[in-house]
Swiss-Prot record:
This is Inactive protein RESTRICTED TEV MOVEMENT 2. PROSITE patterns: SHSP. One of its GO terms (biological process) is defense response. It comes from Arabidopsis thaliana (Mouse-ear cress). Residues 129-220 are annotated as: 6 X 5 AA repeats A of L-E-E-[SKR]-[ERK]. It is a single-pass membrane protein. InterPro entries: A-crystallin/Hsp20_dom, HSP20-like_chaperone. It is found in: Cell membrane. B- repeats lie at residues 163-176, 178-191, 193-205. The chain crosses the membrane at residues 322-342.
Length: 366
């Protein structure tokens, strides 16, 4: 048995060891016999094939070893010229493969001359050399094919690895881009929600401020109205008091002292004078009241319209100025009425205090 020559591996982690078996040729008169020593191989682990194109016999086989290793062989033998190809047969016994190749013509070696034997030996040697050459060429081709196959397989594996790497990088990049887009969309959504909330809060504050301003305006107008009504009421009360005092002065009789006693006699002249005086003041006050009443009515109508405009936020600067002018005019009229009443009351009290003394001096008894 020949020694193991070289080891070859594949991408799957399995290593092959090439095995070169020993072979022996035997030339017999009836046939040519080839014995191949295949110790360690079973019959099912080998294969014998005849190649018609090259007239050669190919013997191949492989068997497993330990540690994911395999032993294999691939041998080629040339079939002799004087051979019946259809009757080639083989047998496997005691680890030896025997291939029998029957001859077309049976030769008797014992009766051949010496020259024939020499020629037969030379032919056999040439056949062995040709067989060796063909075997080496076949092995070289197989080696080249195996190397090409391994190179192709390696390139395919590298290509697949590169494709996997590119796919993984593209997938990772796509995931990063998708995560980035999601974060940007989330940030935009949060910013939009925050902006909307701020706008809503600002709008609510603006509405509250406008409502508060409207309430203040209404309260101011209400206070002005109440103040004007209070002043009007006060003037009316003062007027009623003044009128009642005038009536008492007009109806009070004048006492005249005589010798027989005192007699109350009215004085039409003075009464008419007082009446005329009271009448003049009354006319002034009455005119002021009428003007004030008209002004108040007008102010009420304007106030209602202005209040409606304030509620609708339609009041203008001219209407505000007009409201201020109306208030000032009312105050002026109230002051004028108060002044006239005060002047009249002062003159009435001074005349009443001087009249009794004059009457008493004129009616003093003799």
């Amino acid at each position: 048995m020949a020694a193991r020559q070289q080891q070859k591996g594949t991408g799957f982690g399995v290593q092959y060891e090439d095995f070169v078996p020993k072979s022996e040729w035997k030339d017999q008169p009836e046939a040519t016999i080839l014995n191949i020593d295949l110790t360690g191989f079973a019959k099912e682990q080998m294969k014998v094939t005849y190649v018609h194109s090259s007239k050669m016999i190919r013997v191949t086989g492989e068997r497993p070893l330990a540690n994911r290793k395999w032993s294999r062989f691939n041998e080629v033998f040339t079939v002799p010229q004087n051979c019946l190809v259809d009757k080639i047969h083989g047998s496997f016994k005691n680890n030896v493969l025997t291939i029998t190749m029957p001859k077309e013509t049976i030769t008797k070696v014992a009766y051949l001359p010496e020259t024939s034997r020499t020629e037969a030996a030379a032919l056999e040697k040439a056949a062995k050399l040709e067989e060796k050459r063909l075997l080496e060429e076949s092995r070289r081709k197989e080696k080249e094919e195996e190397e090409a196959k391994q190179m192709k397989k390696q390139l395919l594996e590298e290509k697949e690895a590169l494709i996997r790497k590119l796919q993984e990088e593209a997938k990772a990049k796509e995931e990063v881009e998708m995560r980035k887009l999601q974060e940007e969309a989330k940030a935009k959504e949060e910013a939009a929600a925050k902006k909307l909330q701020e706008e809503i809060e600002a709008k609510e504050k603006l509405e509250e401020r406008k409502l508060e301003e409207r309430r203040l305006e209404e309260r101011k107008l209400e206070d002005m109205k109440l103040a004007e009504e209070a002043k009007l009421k006060k003037i009316q009360e003062r007027k009623s008091v003044d009128e009642s005092g005038e009536k008492e002065k007009i109806l009070k009789p004048e006492v005249v002292y005589t010798k027989s006693g005192h007699v109350a006699t009215p004085k039409p002249e003075s009464g008419s004078g007082l009446k005329s005086g009271f009448g003049g003041v009354g006319e002034v006050v009455k005119s002021a009241e009428e003007k004030l009443g008209n002004l108040v009515e007008k102010e009420k109508k304007m106030g209602k319209g202005i209040m409606e405009k304030i509620r609708r936020k339609e009041i203008t600067s001219e209407e505000k100025k007009l409201m201020m002018n109306v208030g000032v005019a009312a105050l002026v009229i109230f002051a004028l009425g108060a002044y006239v009443s005060y002047t009249f009351c002062s003159s009435s009290s001074s005349s009443s205090s001087s009249s009794p003394s004059s009457s008493s001096s004129s009616t003093k008894p003799e």
